[in-house]
């Protein structure tokens, strides 16, 4: 079923597709394009990586952090752009094996592990901490991978004054507390597939 998901995340021409409803993608671009970010950080590589590089001409550097080796390879093969710094950083503690499980049982086991990643910082510590080791500050941060509640805090610390942090799938309750710590985030409406939440760092 993971292979089928990978196929779904590719467009009809084999290119990486943005896994967002068109309404949410329009909301994202309405925020990002006027911001004219030069340095962008994202946790969770894929269609958004390709979209940023092709549709946001102000970008000089895009740092993208991915935790899944197979998906990292797909993104690396699909995007050839000198502005991209793509990093593979796996979990500090491996997810449970799904060998021999039905698709439903495998999804349940992985979902339980992903929820643990929102509560137990040691599970994805290196993944969350990798951007800080690079010595950059960012104008835009997109949180769309694993351990999002911890990436929110880490990304906020690396954000330039006046910069923007975006969270995808913000309707999930496990992320709410981390976003509220940023001050006055806005949950965008309407949404159909994965809600966006935006917070701007005071200048």
Describe these PLM feature segments.
Residues 128-140, 146-203:
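C-terminal substrate-binding/active-site "lid" region of AdoMet-derived donor-dependent transferases
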Residues 76-135:
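S-adenosyl-L-methionine
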Residues 14, 27, 32, 51-54, ...:
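N-terminal targeting/anchoring "stem" of glycan-biosynthesis enzymes
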Residues 43, 67, 145, 169-170:
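Generic detector of well-ordered alpha-helical packing
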Residues 28-29, 33-36, 132-141:
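N-terminal/domain-start segments enriched in small and hydrophobic, helix-friendly residues
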Residues 40, 64, 142, 166-167:
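Generic enzyme active-site microenvironment
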């Amino acid at each position: 079923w993971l292979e089928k998901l990978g196929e779904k995340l590719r467009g009809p021409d084999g290119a990486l597709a943005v896994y967002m409803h068109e309404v949410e993608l329009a909301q994202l671009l309405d925020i990002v394009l006027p911001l004219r970010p030069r340095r962008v950080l994202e946790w969770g590589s894929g269609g958004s990586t390709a979209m940023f590089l092709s549709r946001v001409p102000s970008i000089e550097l895009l740092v993208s952090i991915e935790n899944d080796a197979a998906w990292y390879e797909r993104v690396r093969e699909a995007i050839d752009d000198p502005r991209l710094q793509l990093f593979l950083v796996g979990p500090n503690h491996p997810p449970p094996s799904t060998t021999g499980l039905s698709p439903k049982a495998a999804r349940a086991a992985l979902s339980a592990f992903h929820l643990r990643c929102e509560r137990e910082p040691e599970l994805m510590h290196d993944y969350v901490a990798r951007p800080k080791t690079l010595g950059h500050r960012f104008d835009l941060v997109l949180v769309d991978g694993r351990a999002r509640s911890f990436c929110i805090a880490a990304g906020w610390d690396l954000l330039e004054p006046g910069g923007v942090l975006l969270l995808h799938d913000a309707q999930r309750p496990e992320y709410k507390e981390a976003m509220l710590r940023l001050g006055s985030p806005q949950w965008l409406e309407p949404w159909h597939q994965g809600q966006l939440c935006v917070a701007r760092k005071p200048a």
